[in-house]
Amino acid sequence: LRFRAPPGVVGAAYNEIGVAAVAMGGGDILPALEKGAIDAAEWCCPQPDSVFGFQKVLKHYYLQGLHQVVVNADFYLNGDVYDSLSATEKKALEVAANASLSKSQSYRIGTNGAALKDLTENHGVILEDTPADYFTEYMAAAKKLLEEAAAENEFFAEVWQSQKDFADIVVPFWAGAQTSNASLG
């Protein structure tokens, strides 16, 4: 399987589990699929995927992935510029960023739900369940690569440990909340 995936740890983890990860920009995915240069692809979520036209070639959609479970908007500002801002301006940026994130997540949930419905009802796309063994295999491969990176880079190890500590706290709650929320529909 030749699969368009991001480079770095993500692509390396796919390679570890026997998937030939191919890195390419978004605009190259559909032509690569049409020419048979790749067999499958990931990009984002139903709405952007449908805008790119993947449904013209791909008819099986797997929503549940691991390497990117959320999409968040990013805002970058030069550190010197940020430092030159007043406390009020910094607070205004913080409030605007938080409001934007909240609105963005609500918007994405709605537009992606509508796009998934359109893909399945109007374009012959079949929504598939990701095989359970994918999750354990991918996570084992990713963990191996992350442990190797942590052994080579002290700062990476510190950040990764912080992320694991955070996950130990939030994952049990969030997984449980999402399971119960899913049962409402």
Name the predicted role of every residue range:
Residues L1-G185:
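N-terminal secretory/targeting leader peptides
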